[in-house]
Amino acid sequence: WEGGKHPIKVAPYTRSMLDTYRNNVTACLILSTSKEKGSFDVAATDKFLYALAPLPFATGLFPLALGEEIGIEFLPAVKEAVNMSFSERNKLGFKMAMKKDLGFFFGLGSVAYAVSLSLSSLTNGGGGGGVKLSSLMQCKPHMILRLLQAKRRCKKENRAMLPKDLFHLKGFMVAGTDNLCYKEDLEELWGIRPMELFAGTEPSIMGTETWTRKGMYFFPDTAFYEFITEKDMMRNYEDPSYIPSTYLMDEVRPGEKYELVFTILKGGAFARYRCGDMYRCVGLENREDETRIPRFE
């Protein structure tokens, strides 16, 4: 992040914050595989496509924190990926996925979309990174069969091969403020609807959708949450001397848009911090996932 008076935005993290972060990203990983209550599918042998910006960017914490809880393999390995360019990571990750298969994918909405298009290009032999006959012998038998079936199906349907033709993801997660712009396209490319997360430099990870993919719930152990109505936020921008009222989680109303205000727990440095993000309350309960707490988008 660059701009304003300071070239880099940084935020301090305590060990307790990192422990909470680890627990919550693990919960997100599990939830991303779920289609209904009590149905999960995560194994230590699963493979994870590395499509994240490395440290000091906040996304660089994800593989490190997850590695403390479960030994999922990243493609390519984190130690190698951090020293590669975006294009190099995509090409190597694709080649490794063809050999080992792929179970998970996580990235910022726009970045995930760019990676997906890059994989589609590689799948169809573009960019010099396509699957060559010489490398097929190194692939698992079921991946060779899947590739042959995908080529036949795509030829019959007269279309280009997509990532979903080769990889059957268990879980797909996206974060960022532009997710809504890419969700439909990402679902078409991968054959699975991405689960949206709320994360940022200052708060770490704060919220996630469930198997219903119908709004995010905030993690109660990450921060204390307050909300400013859109009307009051705009008035405050026009008149900086105006102090807007804040509302608590049990005071938000469905359909209303709010600016999020949070106080980081576990020794964080941000108290009643306004990050500028806006969220709409989409409901106070959801029968599908049996919740009675507000959810947002």
PLM-predicted stretches and their roles:
Residues W1-V10:
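Conserved adenylation A10 loop of the ANL superfamily
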Residues V10-P12, L119-S120:
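Short coil/turn segments at secondary-structure boundaries
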Residues Y13-T20:
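General structural concept
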Residues T20-C28, G93, Y182:
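Alpha-helical packing segments of well-folded alpha/beta enzyme cores
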Residues V25-L75, K79-M84:
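Conserved AMP-binding loop of ANL adenylate-forming enzymes
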Residues A65-E297:
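Active-site glycine/GP-rich loop and adjacent strand/helix microenvironment
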